[in-house]
A protein has these predicted regions:
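Short Gly/aromatic-enriched secondary-structure transition segments
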Residues: 102-106, 215-222, 279-286
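Internal alpha/beta scaffold segment
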Residues: 271-297
Length: 414
């Protein structure tokens, strides 16, 4: 089985100067906006809160808890790793309390530790697995930017930097860059650019891999899936019995599907009946590492998992503010390391695409590789785990202890 996961993340900054309204925030650009945007951010600061977990990957689960708690869509896909990378780039230009809040939100002790995280430095390009991160900074040639900001992002994040006129031709160039760095899956993220736009920062994350244990497509059957509202829908349910990592507690059951030729594991998590996805995310925030360690003693599992795909687009602005990163989004922002002109973040956007099926587009001979500390002690009788109601997933890089992607599946047929 192969899965593909593509993500496009943008960071949007704005000048505090009063000019005309900004264009579509989904473009993720630095531009001039109304002061009304600043005032709205200031208002939101006082009414949005969420628990921040000082645990490994606490940032990821805080995002997941917040988004699953407020999102009306049944299927969610976010990338904490991509968000962190985009914020790490802009953090190189943040100063004083603005920088402190960014670091605190990301659970980073210092800017140096944030810039030097291993996940940024270990792209995987094996025969069956590919994980790449790409960063770019597009600067309006009329916008002055400090050389040290550019130098730091080239050094730590290998950012491609281009000083160009912001017009339709540049928009096409940016779209082509995104297409090239997402294997053609995300092609059109900028409709138009003009001189009100000052800078566009983009992080693209592309992941493709084959399961160690494929599903037999002939075993896939039409079966009912009960949605959160109690109604049912018919899904393509994949089946196999395998030896893999499994664990449970009083609140959830979780099973891992390792990706061949890598240290990437995909965890599928089934909360107990009656538990919301937001409650399950909060439980994972403080128990995920413990549950993972307990799961390293493998079990025979009879697994039933629906085939699904997700296309998702969201703003992370509200979530980040709720985590305490407030100054960056209003007139208190200090991005003096980017420019002497006052700037603040207008938005942080993500576009994601995830597809999981039995084989994938490039299914071939798969090399089975075990993680070194996985103790194989299977039980005699397989444990049955059936994902026939809403569940969570977490895609991890166990080598760097990073959460690449996470989200929920509430309707596999969407």
């Amino acid at each position: 089985m192969k899965f593909r996961h593509f993500i496009y993340a943008t960071l949007l900054l704005a000048s505090c100067a009063t000019t005309k309204d900004a264009t579509d925030a989904a473009q993720g650009v630095i531009k001039d906006t109304h002061n009304s945007s600043v005032n709205a951010a200031q208002e939101n600061k006082n009414r949005m809160t969420i628990k921040r977990y000082n645990t490994p990957n606490g940032f990821a689960f805080s995002l997941l808890e917040y988004i699953t708690g407020k999102e009306t869509q049944e299927n969610i896909c976010i990338s904490p790793a991509s968000a962190e990378c985009a914020l790490a780039m802009v953090a190189n230009g943040a100063r004083e309390r603005t920088l402190e809040q960014i670091l605190s939100t990301l659970n980073s002790k210092s800017l140096d530790s944030l810039n030097n995280k291993e996940i940024y430095k270990q792209p995987i390009k094996e025969s069956g697995t590919k994980l790449t991160l790409a960063n770019s900074i597009w600067v309006n040639k009329k916008q002055p930017v400090k050389e040290q900001f550019i130098a730091d992002n080239k050094k730590y994040h290998n950012a491609y930097v281009s000083n160009v006129p912001f017009n339709d031709n540049t928009a096409s160039t940016i779209n082509e860059w995104c297409s090239q760095n997402t294997n053609g899956k995300i092609n059109n993220i900028v409709d138009k650019l003009d001189d009100k736009t000052k800078m566009l920062l983009i992080n693209a994350l592309y992941l493709k891999g084959a399961w160690m244990d494929e599903f037999n497509k002939n075993a896939t059957t039409d079966e009912p899936f009960t949605k959160a509202d109690g109604t049912t829908t018919t899904v393509k349910m994949m089946h196999q019995t395998l030896t893999t990592s499994y664990n449970l507690d009083n609140n959830l059951r979780m099973i891992s599907m390792p990706i061949a030729e890598s240290y990437i594991w995909v965890w599928f998590i089934l909360p107990r009946k009656g538990m919301s996805m937001s409650e399950a995310a909060a439980h994972l925030a403080t128990n995920f590492n413990k549950l993972c360690k307990g799961a390293y003693h493998s079990q025979r599992v009879k697994l039933s998992l629906p085939r699904f795909s997700i296309e998702y687009k969201t703003s992370l602005k509200e979530s980040l503010m709720a985590l305490g990163m407030t100054d960056a989004f209003d007139k208190n922002a200090n991005f003096g390391g980017i420019s002497d002109k006052p700037l603040y973040i207008d938005d942080v956007m993500q576009n994601t695409y995830l597809k999981i099926d039995e084989k994938g587009a490039e299914a071939a001979a798969i090399t089975h590789v075990s993680v070194g500390y996985l103790a194989m002690r299977p039980t005699k009788e397989p444990i049955e785990v059936k994902f026939d109601r809403p569940f969570l997933y977490v895609i991890t890089d166990v080598m760097t202890n990073s959460i690449l992607f996470t989200g929920q599946v509430g309707n596999p047929t969407e």
